[in-house]
Structures are given as C-alpha cells and as structure tokens.
Amino acid sequence: MNSPQETPTLACADAWFATNVQRCPRSAEWKHGARAGCFKAHGLAFERSPWPSGTAQDDARNAGFQYGYEQAKHDLKAEGAL
C-alpha cells in the first residue's frame, strides 16, 4: 500500500505515463521500461527487468527505461517540480 505522501506522486507518474507512453506504438517491453523510468524520475520504487540480461526484451525494456526516466525528469524540471 502506498503512503499518503506517495499517492499524489504516484498519480502524477501514472498520468505522465498515460499521456506520453501508453498509446505509442512501442513494444510492451519498451513500455514496461518507460513506466519504470518514469517512476524513478518521480522518486518512486520501480520494477526491475523480468527478462534475462542480454535478451531483445531486456534491451527494449532498458531503452524504454532510459526514455521514461530522462523525459519525465525533463518534464518535471520544466514544471518546476524538481
């Protein structure tokens, strides 16, 4: 269960993901990573990669993670949240 302090942040992270990633034509693995990266940028715990290291799925997840983290962090800075 999320603490009361995390709830607004979780809602913000989910809203960012829904707006920027959810409907893009990327793989499920990439989207999984983008969501994890977004969570990290918002200061939340994120899920590790469930795929073995070096697989195409893990590579896609890592690329998504990088995008999600960098873009969400950029957007948070632009909004003055960081």
Over which residues does each language-model region extend?
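Intrinsic-disorder/low-complexity detector
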Residues: 1-82
